[in-house]
Amino acid sequence: VDMGALDGTGTAAMDGDLLALHSETGMAAVPWSAQANGLFDKMARGALDTLRPAHRRLYAPPENQRRFERARQLAAETGLSINQIVLGYLMSQPFTTVPVVGPRSPEQLEDTLRAGDVLLSPEQVRFLETGERA
């Protein structure tokens, strides 16, 4: 997330300090827009231009292109969809995470529901975060 794009919105993003707080305390997280308005799915479909300009500024900094490439690689290795990788990543944190989702079609809803059983290994989480393999 481009933190500068959040200025004046009243919205907070999970940065390193907040991630550490949740990890250390076990406090649950409820990420709103857990799928970043479908960013990675849109990237996978070559439809990034359908993302609203404000959302593109917020969710599409260069680091997310690198994260997308890693998510796409992991999706190919596991047979999961990009959406399932994204939600699986959130639900594989060392604290309870309850992603808020907003599917816009029956197909998106089905894909999202299938993500409910996805737990990634610590190695897969590390790969998504850093690109490093064990």
Where are the predicted features?
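Beta/alpha (TIM)-barrel catalytic core signal, keyed to glycine-rich beta->alpha loops juxtaposed to Asp/Glu
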Residues: V1-R133
